[in-house]
């Protein structure tokens, strides 16, 4: 297991998560989520939680309503 703190993922893990969020998919399917979790050394639950929180942060920064999934919705 990686040197993850109780406050969240390590810098290296966040780098992997951010890359996938920004360059690959903001809404990963279960298989992709599993692969991202394995790459980052996190559980699927931790990865899913991170994506959910990061998506909410992204929505706020884009001025989108919280229930909106993407710009095209």
Swiss-Prot record:
Result of knocking out the encoding gene: Mice display partial embryonic lethality and heart failure.
DNA-binding region, residue range(s): 3-62
Family matches, as PROSITE patterns: HOMEOBOX_2 (PS50071)
GO CC field: cytoplasm; nucleus
Pfam families for this protein: Homeodomain
Coiled-coil features, chain-numbered ranges: none
Gene Ontology biological process terms in this record: chaperone-mediated protein complex assembly; heart development; lung alveolus development; negative regulation of cell differentiation; negative regulation of transcription by RNA polymerase II; positive regulation of gap junction assembly; positive regulation of skeletal muscle tissue regeneration; positive regulation of striated muscle cell differentiation
SUPFAM superfamilies xrefs: Homeodomain-like (SSF46689)
Source superkingdom: Eukaryota
Alphabetized UniProt keyword annotations: Cytoplasm, Developmental protein, Homeobox, Nucleus, Repressor, Transcription, Transcription regulation
Tissue expression as described in the entry: Expressed in the embryonic and adult heart and in the adult brain, liver, lung, skeletal muscle, intestine and spleen. Throughout embryonic and postnatal development, it is expressed in the myocardium.
Induction: By the transcription factor NKX2-5 that acts as a direct regulator.
Localisation per UniProt entry: Nucleus; Cytoplasm
GO molecular function: DNA binding; histone deacetylase regulator activity
Assembly with partners or alone: Interacts with serum response factor (SRF). Component of a large complex containing histone deacetylases such as HDAC2. Interacts with the acetylated forms of HSPA1A and HSPA1B. Interacts with HSPA8.
The protein's role, per its UniProt record: Atypical homeodomain protein which does not bind DNA and is required to modulate cardiac growth and development. Acts via its interaction with SRF, thereby modulating the expression of SRF-dependent cardiac-specific genes and cardiac development. Prevents SRF-dependent transcription either by inhibiting SRF binding to DNA or by recruiting histone deacetylase (HDAC) proteins that prevent transcription by SRF. Overexpression causes cardiac hypertrophy. Acts as a co-chaperone for HSPA1A and HSPA1B chaperone proteins and assists in chaperone-mediated protein refolding.
Protein name: Homeodomain-only protein
Native organism: Mus musculus (Mouse)
């Amino acid at each position: 297991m990686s040197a993850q703190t109780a406050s969240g993922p390590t810098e290296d893990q966040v780098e992997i998560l951010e890359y996938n969020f920004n360059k690959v998919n903001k809404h990963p399917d279960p298989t992709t989520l599993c692969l991202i979790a394995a790459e980052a050394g996190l559980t699927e639950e931790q990865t899913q939680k991170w994506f959910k929180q990061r998506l909410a942060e992204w929505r706020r920064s884009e001025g989108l309503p919280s229930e909106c999934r993407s710009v095209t919705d």
